[in-house]
Amino acid sequence: SIYVNFKLNNIPAVFAEAGVDLERAYVLIWTTTPWTLPSNTAVSLGPDIDYCFVEADGKFMMFAKDMVEAVAKVAGWESYRIVETNGEPVTMKGDQFGDITYICPVLHENTGRIIWGEHVTLDAGTGAVHTAPGHGVDDYKVGMKFGVDTIMPIDDDGRFTDYVPQWAGLTTDEANPKIIEWLRERGTLILHEDINHSYPHCWRCKQPVIFR
């Protein structure tokens, strides 16, 4: 899995008034499938989850308040703070982030939207979920609900098309480490860690399923 900063284009006024600097403001996303990042068009939040900005390493990063301690630990932040007003953390529910957009750092630097969906949990990650409607049922459903674009750079053979010229012809497994390195070189990768998690496989050939 990887934790990646997406640069925010704008932020809710309540956070700006609390001192969040837009020039250093990001949404910190989490995903177990780096190869789907070229298809990113949204970041999903949980509608009833509280989100805050954390200042660390010279950046303001927005993600779920209840995940701050866990993220700080795995990211190795020696010093961090939750943005506050009058001694109280400034928070906002996921379904209150209207008209907030960001720049996806992979390749074409597409503009994406902050949206929300019931599928977002706090079991792992940041509570801010990379969303690619072209890959996966949950992503597709929430993408259609909010009318975000669907990008599909994977062909019938499971290889990247010319939409992503740097990785055209590569399988998703071959592209994964290259995408991670791309993010690391650009300073947007916060953490890369190996985890064990369930993933659907074809019952006939026993290979991982690629959703398109």
Task: List where the protein language model places each region.
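Residue patterns forming the tRNA-binding/recognition surfaces of aminoacyl-tRNA synthetases
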Residues: S1-P38, Y51, D99-I103, E109-T111, ...
